[in-house]
Amino acid sequence: GQSDLTIERELDASQALIDSLNEHGVDLGEITRNLESEGVVKFEDAYNSLLDTIGRKRAQYVDDLKDLAEPVRSAVKKAAEGVIVKRLFEHDPTFWTQDVNAFDEITNRLGWLGLPEKQFAFLPELTAFRKKVEGLGFTNAFVLGMGGSSLAPEVMSLTLTPQAGGIDLQIIDTTNPDEILARLEGVDLTKTLVIVSSKSGGTSETNAALQYFWKLYEDLGINDIGKHFVAITDPGTSLEVMAREKGFSQTFLAPADVGGRYSVFTTFGLVPGAVIGVDLQGLLEKAHMADLRS
């Protein structure tokens, strides 16, 4: 067959056919009213059935919670009597164990507690870095990182509204060549900042991505490649050394006592946040307020 716009053809004949239906006992008005009333009834029945199902499910879930009431009350009472929140924020290792041999390891993992308040002092440096990025004319940025080193920037780029002056940010947390090529499509590398992010400094996937991106700039014949690269890592890592040797534009060091999953308020989250134009002052204020309320 052949598709064609036929609805506008022979309009007079179509109207005459419709008019003739009454002569054969077909009342289109009545048919329409019946269909409408039946449709409303069916919709109402379906809606009421849905509400009944939700009601039964709710009753079931509420009933299931009864068994949790006493354990929750007991846990809250225990937390209050043990001054748990206070001990946690004081980095008290006895909250977890009485083994003195484990104290150092525990206290070296608690830097995330109260971190937002400490990072207010870092804001001037972040503001200066953002202006530097704008001054260099960068319009795009990549974060090369895995896990905690890239999750915070990804969440920020997807959920927070940037201020004026922010640039587009993409995450490279894969070694899949097709995906990397797709991310690079249409990107002007001469106007691109590459943020190499690794807490350990030795993440193999991140290092592979670094080598690949560095080679891209070499192939473009760019002399001062280092100005396109920034490193984020812990103090004393191989990445810190490499960044210095290769002449990276800047290296940001993160506190060693903050694990990757808590790194949103360390340089791993705040530096990319500055690049894309996140209101870091407002972000830290809200996080600090949450700390105070806890």
PLM-predicted stretches and their roles:
Residues 127-293:
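Glycine-rich phosphate-binding loops that contact phosphosugars or nucleotide phosphates
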Residues 45-82, 285-290:
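Terminal amphipathic helices with adjacent charged low-complexity linkers/tails
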